[in-house]
Amino acid sequence: FTVDNTAHLLAQLEGGELDFVVLEGIFDKSRYESFLLRNEPYIGICAKDHPFSGCEVPMDELFSERLILREPGSGTRKILERELMQCGYTVEAFRANVCISSFKLIRHLVSEGCGVSFLYEAVVKNDAQFGHFSCPPLTGVHELNVVCLKNTNVPALARRFLDL
């Protein structure tokens, strides 16, 4: 079991180091065998006492904040970048952005009021130190997929494993 960004996980899959991966990011579905594990809310998070907590935030108000985000290659980051791009923006539109590869450190910095972030609800579910906010179209529901190489017996094995 390993946690890493989408690009690294796919490289490990192709290198035979992993049998299957669970991806929350964007990948080439024509290149791999995949099936939907579940749909997961992708949300904005902030410190619990932040003015955004519990609100729907207009995009232009977000840009005055420090954005704390995952490293390039991360599925979580790719989703945010794609949604921003569709609205004509990049992460550079934010007052500042900090790139961190650890969800644990991102959680800590956001809970301390150092900035806002976007990630899957499961990362902070039932944790009272965080406020949640929405900012359509940046937030919404996205797929979590089980991904493996084509033409192997792994899809059936992965399904059985996940049914346990």
What label would you give each PLM region?
Residues 1-4, 24-25, 91-102:
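Short beta-strand-to-loop elements that line the ligand-binding cleft
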Residues 134-164:
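A late-sequence structural motif
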Residues 1-30:
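Central regulatory/effector-binding core of bacterial HTH transcription factors
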Residues 13-14, 62, 107-113, 146:
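Hydrophobic residues within well-ordered alpha-helices
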